[in-house]
């Protein structure tokens, strides 16, 4: 007689083993209709799985995050059902859940086109709308293998042979004539899988190994209702409009080319943004009492072996040789900073020592993973390393947290998710050291009033870590900032200081990044602002346009004066109609459009418009300059009179 305890503490007693669906039906028909799965004693189970003993139970519906993941996974199986009907020779590989959707890797000689994807989606919807039941069967390893061997599913056979023990009992999910294998759970009926869309198809190697066959990966998105699906599709449409690669080309910010894959060619206006970011971060470094250093791009392999990076990152490092010595271009700055720390005897009085660098790093990322500014091979990190005593860790981490939030708020990012990764199973040091380290990070977060999620076991072997993930205007997550404790690298590279008792001690090292990669952060900003940078960041802050040739000298005089006042200004003296000029510079997202005619020239004024079309009227030159300079100095996100 299992006693089932529900989330509200109420209990229901059953005479025989009972499923989650049975419990839902016992509560009411509405809940039974909405039931997708159950969380039994904390573990997700199919709605049909029997509960034999007393248990706690949460009933999962499409409104729950777990329910959404389950229906997405079932949509991947639905894709398999449909593609096998349209192209029976297809061999199915893997079909996992991803953010907002799913994909399925398939082996099909026919190269799928956009029309094929549309036909596949149509067949999926036709099948789903029959609201057929999904039937689960738990079988022996041999029966599962025989099932897939009989269907010619070589990839499923490989998964069984290589990844599943022979004494295991795999679960097979039957979608009418189609059968798939999965840990589950899955929806009990396809009525839950009506709101999806296939998005794209791309190439993907089996098991991610370029030595294996290239498969076709079909991506889809799925949601619990039509409104949520349409909201997501609208968000994707807006994201496409904001694509930094498209806007970067429109605004002539940068380009990339085949001869330097993953490397950025910064054009004048893009480099202006880059330098402005550097200037801003330098102000922060000064405010928080950092030194700025510069290390070499390339160092001997011996150093990378001592640091431990050669063992872990060799495949991602660009290397070269000279005079019988092997060198690696740095993928990160930390070993170089330890070398600077090691120059000269350090005392406890010198700590904390905060060392920052705009370090130019290179990593040999796979060519298929490169994506505009978001995933590159050459990048600049706003990297810093703090050498301190263990007693100073909490205070230093707390300052890092304040610096992160100060910085992000300047750009308008207020929705920041913080995660603390704690000790992994394989780690250096004893439990006391990890207790102190984790407590220091937790206390620093609490002291700053920061809500955070703990990720047990996700820390590095050498110390716990805080990650800062910002959410943009489209609610996309971008992991940028990190604060990582390191109890290993200083010792590996011989860093010591003289403690108060004159003994040599190894400092704790705090790795700290705020923007992360400047290139990537600029990509994020382009998409966040849709190219409409706040005035302080905009490559051109004001453009002055004449109506006739009579005002040309006055325009040139104004531009010269603006530049002297620290305003990035340009002029447009072309023999074009003023409306044409205004439209063109509006499309280039210039914050202020200044028009000069005879009257403005006579009165030593300018007619001021914003790129949003707001007419600010006529202003004196001094009033405009004073207002814009104040706006720039405060790094305001808004234009005048917004």
Swiss-Prot record:
<dbReference type="Pfam" id="PF03129">
    <property type="entry name" value="HGTP_anticodon"/>
</dbReference>
<keyword id="KW-0436">Ligase</keyword>
<keyword id="KW-0648">Protein biosynthesis</keyword>
<dbReference type="InterPro" id="IPR012947">
    <property type="entry name" value="tRNA_SAD"/>
</dbReference>
<dbReference type="GO" id="GO:0046872">
    <property type="term" value="F:metal ion binding"/>
</dbReference>
<dbReference type="InterPro" id="IPR012676">
    <property type="entry name" value="TGS-like"/>
</dbReference>
<keyword id="KW-0030">Aminoacyl-tRNA synthetase</keyword>
<keyword id="KW-0862">Zinc</keyword>
<dbReference type="Pfam" id="PF00587">
    <property type="entry name" value="tRNA-synt_2b"/>
</dbReference>
<dbReference type="InterPro" id="IPR004095">
    <property type="entry name" value="TGS"/>
</dbReference>
<keyword id="KW-0479">Metal-binding</keyword>
<comment type="function">
    <text>Catalyzes the attachment of threonine to tRNA(Thr) in a two-step reaction: L-threonine is first activated by ATP to form Thr-AMP and then transferred to the acceptor end of tRNA(Thr). Also edits incorrectly charged L-seryl-tRNA(Thr).</text>
</comment>
<dbReference type="GO" id="GO:0005829">
    <property type="term" value="C:cytosol"/>
</dbReference>
<dbReference type="InterPro" id="IPR047246">
    <property type="entry name" value="ThrRS_anticodon"/>
</dbReference>
<keyword id="KW-0963">Cytoplasm</keyword>
<dbReference type="InterPro" id="IPR002314">
    <property type="entry name" value="aa-tRNA-synt_IIb"/>
</dbReference>
<dbReference type="GO" id="GO:0004829">
    <property type="term" value="F:threonine-tRNA ligase activity"/>
</dbReference>
<keyword id="KW-0820">tRNA-binding</keyword>
<feature type="binding site">
    <location>
        <position position="511"/>
    </location>
    <ligand>
        <name>Zn(2+)</name>
    </ligand>
</feature>
<dbReference type="InterPro" id="IPR012675">
    <property type="entry name" value="Beta-grasp_dom_sf"/>
</dbReference>
<dbReference type="InterPro" id="IPR004154">
    <property type="entry name" value="Anticodon-bd"/>
</dbReference>
<dbReference type="InterPro" id="IPR045864">
    <property type="entry name" value="aa-tRNA-synth_II/BPL/LPL"/>
</dbReference>
<comment type="similarity">
    <text>Belongs to the class-II aminoacyl-tRNA synthetase family.</text>
</comment>
<feature type="domain" description="TGS">
    <location>
        <begin position="1"/>
        <end position="61"/>
    </location>
</feature>
<feature type="binding site">
    <location>
        <position position="385"/>
    </location>
    <ligand>
        <name>Zn(2+)</name>
    </ligand>
</feature>
<dbReference type="GO" id="GO:0005524">
    <property type="term" value="F:ATP binding"/>
</dbReference>
<dbReference type="Pfam" id="PF07973">
    <property type="entry name" value="tRNA_SAD"/>
</dbReference>
<dbReference type="InterPro" id="IPR002320">
    <property type="entry name" value="Thr-tRNA-ligase_IIa"/>
</dbReference>
<keyword id="KW-0067">ATP-binding</keyword>
<feature type="region of interest" description="Catalytic">
    <location>
        <begin position="243"/>
        <end position="534"/>
    </location>
</feature>
<dbReference type="InterPro" id="IPR006195">
    <property type="entry name" value="aa-tRNA-synth_II"/>
</dbReference>
<comment type="subunit">
    <text>Homodimer.</text>
</comment>
<dbReference type="Pfam" id="PF02824">
    <property type="entry name" value="TGS"/>
</dbReference>
<keyword id="KW-0694">RNA-binding</keyword>
<dbReference type="InterPro" id="IPR036621">
    <property type="entry name" value="Anticodon-bd_dom_sf"/>
</dbReference>
<dbReference type="InterPro" id="IPR033728">
    <property type="entry name" value="ThrRS_core"/>
</dbReference>
<dbReference type="InterPro" id="IPR018163">
    <property type="entry name" value="Thr/Ala-tRNA-synth_IIc_edit"/>
</dbReference>
<dbReference type="GO" id="GO:0006435">
    <property type="term" value="P:threonyl-tRNA aminoacylation"/>
</dbReference>
<dbReference type="GO" id="GO:0000049">
    <property type="term" value="F:tRNA binding"/>
</dbReference>
<protein>
    <recommendedName>
        <fullName>Threonine--tRNA ligase</fullName>
        <ecNumber>6.1.1.3</ecNumber>
    </recommendedName>
</protein>
<feature type="binding site">
    <location>
        <position position="334"/>
    </location>
    <ligand>
        <name>Zn(2+)</name>
    </ligand>
</feature>
<keyword id="KW-0547">Nucleotide-binding</keyword>
């Amino acid at each position: 007689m299992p006693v089932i305890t529900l989330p509200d503490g109420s209990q229901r007693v059953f005479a025989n083993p009972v499923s989650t669906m049975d419990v839902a039906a016992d509560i009411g028909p509405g809940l039974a209709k909405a039931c997708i799965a159950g969380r039994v004693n904390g573990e997700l189970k199919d709605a049909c799985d029997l509960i034999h003993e007393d248990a706690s139970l949460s009933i999962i519906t499409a409104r729950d995050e777990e329910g959404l993941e389950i229906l997405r996974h079932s949509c991947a199986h639905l894709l398999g059902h449909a593609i096998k009907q349209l192209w029976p020779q297809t061999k199915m590989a893997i079909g996992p859940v991803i953010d907002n959707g799913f994909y399925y890797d398939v082996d099909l000689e026919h190269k799928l086109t956009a029309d094929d994807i549309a036909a596949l989606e149509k067949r999926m919807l036709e099948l789903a709308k029959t609201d057929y039941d999904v039937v689960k069967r738990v079988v022996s390893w041999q029966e599962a293998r025989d099932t897939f061997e009989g269907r010619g599913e070589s990839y499923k056979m490989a998964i069984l042979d290589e990844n599943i023990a022979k004494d295991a009992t795999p679960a097979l999910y039957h979608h009418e004539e189609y059968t798939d294998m999965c840990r589950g759970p899955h929806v009990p009926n396809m009525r839950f899988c009506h709101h999806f869309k296939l998005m794209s198809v791309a190439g993907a190697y089996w098991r991610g190994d370029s030595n294996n066959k290239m498969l076709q990966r079909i991506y889809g998105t799925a949601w619990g209702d039509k409104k949520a699906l349409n909201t997501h599709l609208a968000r994707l449409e807006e994201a496409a409009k904001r694509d930094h690669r498209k806007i970067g080309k429109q605004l002539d910010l940068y380009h990339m080319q085949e001869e330097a894959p993953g490397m950025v060619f910064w054009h004048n206006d893009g480099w202006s943004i880059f330098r402005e970011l550097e200037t801003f971060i330098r102000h922060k470094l000064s405010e928080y009492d950092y030194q700025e250093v510069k290390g070499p791009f390339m160092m001997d392999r011996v150093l990378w072996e001592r640091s431990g990076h050669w063992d872990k990152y060799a495949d991602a490092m660009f290397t070269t040789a000279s005079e019988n010595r092997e060198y690696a271009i740095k993928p990160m700055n930390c070993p170089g900073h330890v070398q600077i720390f090691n120059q000269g005897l350090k005392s406890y009085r010198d700590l904390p020592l905060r060392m920052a660098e705009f370090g130019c790093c290179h990593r040999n990322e796979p060519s298929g993973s490169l994506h505009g500014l978001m995933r590159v091979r050459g990048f600049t990190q706003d990297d810093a390393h703090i050498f301190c005593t263990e007693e100073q860790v909490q205070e230093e981490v707390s300052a890092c947290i304040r610096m992160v939030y100060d910085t992000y708020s300047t750009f308008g990012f207020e929705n920041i998710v913080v995660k603390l990764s704690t000790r992994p199973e394989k780690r250096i040091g004893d439990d006391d050291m990890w207790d102190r380290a984790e407590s220091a990070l937790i206390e620093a977060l609490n002291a700053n009033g920061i809500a955070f999620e703990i990720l047990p076991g996700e820390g590095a072997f050498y110390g716990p870590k805080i990650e800062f993930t910002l959410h943009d205007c489209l609610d996309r997550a971008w992991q940028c900032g990190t604060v990582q404790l390191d109890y290993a690298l200083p010792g590996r590279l011989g860093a010591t200081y003289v403690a108060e008792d004159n003994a040599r001690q190894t400092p704790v090292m705090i790795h700290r990044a705020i923007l992360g990669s400047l290139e990537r952060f600029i990509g994020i900003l382009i998409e966040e602002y849709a190219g409409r940078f706040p005035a302080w960041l905009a490559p051109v802050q004001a453009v002055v346009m004449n109506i006739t040739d009579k005002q040309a000298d006055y325009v040139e005089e104004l531009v010269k004066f603006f530049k002297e006042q620290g305003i990035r200004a340009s002029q447009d003296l072309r023999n074009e109609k003023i409306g044409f000029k205004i439209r063109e510079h509006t499309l280039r997202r210039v914050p202020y459009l200044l028009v000069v005619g005879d009257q403005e020239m006579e009165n030593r004024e300018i007619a001021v418009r914003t790129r949003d079309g707001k007419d600010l009227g006529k202003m004196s030159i001094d009033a405009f300059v004073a207002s814009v300079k104040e706006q720039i100095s405060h790094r305001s996100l808004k234009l005048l009179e917004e």
